[in-house]
């Protein structure tokens, strides 16, 4: 009995000794309430039952109408705070980002399939700062990106040839599928120097990144690797790892031969993986780059640059089909600047302001990540409420993009709003770099997407090329080509990492005069 009492007192003493001492800041926040929350909160699942019948951004809009622009939920056992105004976005992502909101939330799938090395997801710290600097200074700097421009041009020409062949045969093309092939091949060529083998595995990775499991939100289950979800992660990892191992081995040999002065025929030089392998061999680097770091970065580039750009481009094409006056105005600009005798080049987009405005308007209405996520790393006060440490923070970017308080006629696809200045509700020169909090398709602050320029430039180039070369004929339910006012496509959404269209965009391309023969030749 005395022994049990002594052990109990020892455990209590250890608990009191190891428990974090409350800081002056945490003591000051004790009297503050949590943001308002719906009732009831159910055992085990929290408020997840309130989200089951709608896409997340729609469910959060409904809840914000009842509980205000800042409210709290429980996703299982995880406290969650939802913000839905630009003013709140700025408080979280600018005013308090450095101290409390500089880390992203990651699911079990993201953590394991990025080898716990994702620069997009790892906690803020020395590794993140080092790799982020490496990406910006060595992988996405102007010199490297410009050097790889022929690769990007090659992939766009390949896409246009598929369109030209479809036009010549007058057969329907699944543009949803072709756009994914384009973005996947482009990223794969720039990252690895090859395009084919990794494509299908990358799609599986992206699909599971857009899904959640109860184990991600219920604390007792968090570290259990059980169930179908975890088995899928294992299966994907078992397929992906041997492929990327083979590519790394191949590129390492190419880098070695080039260092020895050999000419390696038929292989692309200067791809991102070559640079990473050179850094991995550099013993003077402040952080040693391991093979797992490289694998994680490969997944990062695929997840950031494949699905999001393809889905955004598809949304843009759907909007252009449904808004023929916008399409005609865009075509007039392309013909005026580029003409009909040569194909659009990436550098032309700097002289195509209306095309760039179409890209911005697409991201306003269809942001790649409709709900941006962060994690609270230190307790904080926002608008008189306490935000608890460890809370998941959700920013409903989709809601702000459709809010009439911040946008004039927000349900209309009107690129002109990004070219007009001075009028109330107009955007004028707003950019996509995260400093205008009513427009955050790529996030903001330290954790915003580093590839925003590459993504928007590629999207603008492909859109301008398609507008220059083809009309898209929409099919009806019986496979017939629709004409006039009937030539519309559905704008219904479905769940996914980037919330794509619910239905594939299937069209019959119609080549404009003289273009098909140039592409096919």
Curated annotation (Swiss-Prot):
Entry EC number(s)? 1.14.14.87
- Bilayer topology term: Single-pass membrane protein
Q: Name the Pfam families for this protein.
A: p450
Q: Which UniProt keywords apply?
A: Endoplasmic reticulum, Heme, Iron, Membrane, Metal-binding, Microsome, Monooxygenase, NADP, Oxidoreductase, Transmembrane, Transmembrane helix
GO terms in the biological process aspect are: isoflavonoid biosynthetic process
Transmembrane annotation, as ranges:
2-23
Q: Which cofactor does it need?
A: heme
**Record's subcellular location:** Endoplasmic reticulum membrane; Microsome membrane
Q: Give the signal sequence positions.
A: none
Q: Which cysteines are joined by disulfide bonds?
A: none
Q: Single GO cellular component annotation?
A: endoplasmic reticulum membrane
Q: Which PROSITE patterns match?
A: CYTOCHROME_P450
* The keyword Lipid biosynthesis appears for this protein: no
Swiss-Prot/TrEMBL catalytic activity: (2S)-liquiritigenin + reduced [NADPH--hemoprotein reductase] + O2 = (2R,3S)-2,4',7-trihydroxyisoflavanone + oxidized [NADPH--hemoprotein reductase] + H2O + H(+); (2S)-naringenin + reduced [NADPH--hemoprotein reductase] + O2 = 2-hydroxy-2,3-dihydrogenistein + oxidized [NADPH--hemoprotein reductase] + H2O + H(+)
What is the superkingdom listed in this entry's lineage?
Answer: Eukaryota
Record-stated family: Belongs to the cytochrome P450 family.
* Purpose: Involved in isoflavonoid biosynthesis. Converts liquiritigenin to 2-hydroxyisoflavanone which spontaneously dehydrates to daidzein.
Q: List the PANTHER family.
A: 3,9-DIHYDROXYPTEROCARPAN 6A-MONOOXYGENASE, CYTOCHROME P450 98A9
What name is this protein filed under? 2-hydroxyisoflavanone synthase
Q: Which organism is it from?
A: Glycine max (Soybean)
């Amino acid at each position: 009995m005395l022994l049990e009492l002594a052990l109990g007192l020892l455990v209590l003493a250890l608990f009191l000794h190891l428990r974090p001492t409350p800081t002056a800041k945490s003591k000051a926040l004790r009297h503050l309430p949590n943001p308002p929350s719906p009732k009831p909160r159910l055992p085990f699942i929290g408020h997840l039952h309130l989200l089951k019948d709608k896409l997340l951004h729609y469910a959060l809009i409904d809840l914000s109408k009842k509980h205000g622009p800042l409210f709290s939920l429980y996703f299982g056992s995880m406290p969650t705070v939802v913000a839905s105004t630009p003013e709140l976005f700025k408080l979280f992502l600018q005013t308090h980002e450095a101290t409390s909101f500089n880390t992203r939330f990651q699911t079990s799938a993201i953590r394991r399939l990025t080898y716990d090395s994702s620069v997009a997801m790892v906690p803020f710290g020395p590794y993140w700062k080092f790799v982020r600097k490496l990406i910006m200074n060595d992988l996405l700097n102007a010199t490297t990106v410009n050097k790889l421009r022929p690769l990007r041009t090659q992939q766009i020409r390949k896409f246009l040839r598929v369109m030209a062949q479809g036009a010549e045969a007058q057969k329907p093309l699944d543009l949803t599928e072709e756009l994914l092939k384009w973005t996947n091949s482009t990223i794969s060529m720039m990252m690895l120097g090859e395009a084919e083998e990794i494509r299908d595995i990358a799609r599986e990775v992206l699909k599971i990144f857009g899904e959640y499991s109860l184990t991600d939100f219920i604390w007792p289950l968090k570290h259990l690797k059980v169930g179908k979800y975890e088995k899928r992660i294992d299966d994907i990892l078992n397929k992906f790892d041997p492929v990327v191992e083979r590519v790394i081995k191949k590129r390492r040999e190419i880098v070695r031969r080039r260092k020895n002065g050999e000419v390696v025929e038929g292989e692309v030089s200067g791809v991102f993986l070559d640079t990473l392998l050179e850094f991995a061999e550099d013993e003077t680097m402040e952080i040693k780059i391991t093979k797992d770091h490289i694998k994680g970065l490969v997944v990062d580039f695929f997840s950031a640059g494949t699905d999001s750009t393809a889905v955004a481009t598809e949304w843009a094409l759907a909007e252009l089909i449904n808004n023929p006056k916008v399409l005609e105005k865009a075509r007039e600009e392309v013909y005026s600047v580029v003409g009909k005798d040569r194909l659009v080049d990436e550098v032309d987009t700097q002289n195509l302001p209306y095309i760039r405005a179409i890209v911005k308007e697409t991201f306003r209405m269809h942001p790649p990540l409709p709900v941006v996520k962060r994690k609270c790393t230190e307790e904080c006060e926002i608008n008189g409420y306490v935000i608890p440490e460890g809370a998941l923070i959700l920013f409903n970017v989709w809601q702000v993009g459709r809010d009439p308080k911040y946008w004039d006629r927000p349900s209309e696809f009107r690129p002109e709003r990004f070219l007009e200045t001075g009028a109330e509700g107009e955007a004028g020169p707003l950019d996509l770099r995260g400093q205008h909090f009513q427009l955050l398709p790529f996030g903001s602050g330290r954790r915003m997407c580093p590839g925003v320029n590459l993504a928007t430039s590629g999207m603008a180039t492909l859109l301008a090329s398609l507008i220059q070369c083809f009309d898209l004929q929409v099919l009806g339910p019986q496979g017939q080509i629709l004409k006039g006012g009937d030539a519309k496509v559905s704008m219904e959404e479905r769940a996914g990492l980037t919330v794509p269209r619910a239905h594939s965009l299937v069209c019959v391309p119609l080549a404009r005069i003289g273009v098909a023969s140039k592409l096919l030749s």
